[in-house]
Amino acid sequence: LVAYARSIEKEHNKNFRFTMTTNGIGITDEVIDWCNKECHNVVLSLDGRKEVNDRFRVDLAGNGSYDRIVPKFQKLVKARGGQGYYMRGTFTHHNVDFTKDLFHMADDLGFTELSMEPVVAPPDSPEALTEEDLPKLFDQYELLANDMLRRQKAGKPITFYHYILDLKHGPCIYKRISGCGSGTEYMAVTPWGDLYPCHQFVGDPNYKLGNVWDGVTNTTLRDEFKLCNVYARPDCKDCWARLYCAGGCAANALHATGDIHGTYEYGCKVFRKRMECALMM
């Protein structure tokens, strides 16, 4: 697929940028060389501390992956010159002290480009974040922001994806209201050729858009996603952060409310706190 895109990009005056996300198990020297040649960015899935990561990231035999993947991640990052990558983790109800996971990746493992996302799970899941978790999460985001400032002053900065904010040259207004563009200008392609609005919808027949041979055949669904923006969500009307989140994630809204035009209020609270910290910094 990448080779095909490279073969036609000059002909069509395009500049394709590829990102690969990996759990690390299949990384080899050959994979590292390919990533350095073809990938603008590489996303490396690691949830932080060994006990946190190995709670969910296990193989078919139930064995944790931490000890196998960390050396591979370190080798890949070194080969990329410490650039063009992100360590991407997920925190759950079991590790609301997620700054410990970020600091472990930075201080113990040597990674500086970091991202940590709140879990998206059914409310009755043991992993789901709760209202009682929110004050702890808010404290964690403030702790992270202050520690990043300390590191910056010490000349050893780290990057946290969700604190990257450009107040002078931000996204155009279209991106500010429509976000990722799932279902219209952004789609997930499965290994068997089916098209979905994004990876979160893969496997749900109600959200299959078409396939790579016939193109988008479910035009009604495409048109529904076309209207999925911040102005389609009444709850966003009075939110000060609405043009930073573009109404939020359609998949999160669907999981929380049953409607892609709904509002995942818990996620809104977390997002606003992240924006407060980013603006403070």
Task: State each model region's role.
Residues 1, 22, 26-28, 51-52, ...:
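Flexible loop/turn segments at secondary-structure boundaries
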Residues 135-169, 199-246:
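C-terminal accessory region of radical SAM enzymes
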Residues 180-183:
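Short, small/polar residue-rich loop motifs at catalytic or cofactor-binding pockets
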Residues 192-194, 206, 231-281:
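Radical SAM enzyme core and accessory elements
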